Every structure is written in structure tokens, then in C-alpha cells.
């Protein structure tokens, strides 16, 4: 049994149908005897939509608040994917970053610094 980490970008989870397809892939991996951790991005277009909202309010606003707003896209996707897995009989639970203990060995510069 292996621990498999799968990462899906916005296009891969961009519609309910694509989220269902990701759920099927996860289940196949679990059925092969693996433990699976899934990391997902916001659905396609959501991050750009939120950046537009941020810029409409205050483009120079707090980096912390921008991060809070932008993280909501991933929260929606993880909830939807967990629901899709559960609807197919697969035990699943969504977590946001603060709920899991991850040790960062390296952090790259913020995209805002580029």
C-alpha cells in the first residue's frame, strides 16, 4: 500500500462533471489498495473572478485579506469533491490548510513578488 498524492488544477475540476470524473479516478486508486490525498485548485475561472472582486474593492489591499478571499475557491472545490466521493460510497473528508499539519521545508517567493 502506498500513499498517493493527486493534484488537480482548475480545468480538471472546472465543472460538476469533471469533479465526478476526478472522484472516479480517486476511487480507482483507493481500490488498488492505496491511501490517497487529493489537492485541488479552485474551479476554472474562479480565481480570476475573485481577483476581479478584490481589484474592484481595493487593488492595493492587505495581502492577508487577499489570501483569505482567494482560498475560498479551493474550499468550494474540496467540499464538492468530498461530496462526489461520498455519493459514490467512498469515505472522504475535506480539509483546509489550517486543519492539517504540513511541515514546509521550502517556501518559494509569493507570486505577488514576481
List PLM regions with ranges.
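Nucleotide/pyrophosphate-binding catalytic subdomain
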Residues: 1-108, 112-114
Amino acid at each position: 500500500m502506498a500513499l498517493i498524492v493527486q493534484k488537480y488544477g482548475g480545468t480538471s475540476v472546472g465543472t460538476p462533471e469533471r469533479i465526478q470524473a476526478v472522484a472516479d479516478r480517486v476511487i480507482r486508486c483507493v481500490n488498488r489498495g492505496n491511501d490517497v490525498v487529493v489537492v485541488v485548485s479552485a474551479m476554472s475561472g474562479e480565481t480570476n473572478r475573485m481577483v476581479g472582486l478584490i481589484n474592484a474593492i481595493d487593488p492595493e489591499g492587505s495581502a492577508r485579506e487577499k489570501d483569505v478571499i482567494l482560498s475560498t475557491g479551493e474550499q468550494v472545490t474540496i467540499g464538492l469533491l468530498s461530496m462526489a466521493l461520498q455519493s459514490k460510497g467512498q469515505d472522504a473528508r475535506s480539509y483546509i490548510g489550517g486543519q492539517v499539519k504540513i511541515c514546509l521545508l521550502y517556501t518559494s517567493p509569493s507570486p505577488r513578488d514576481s
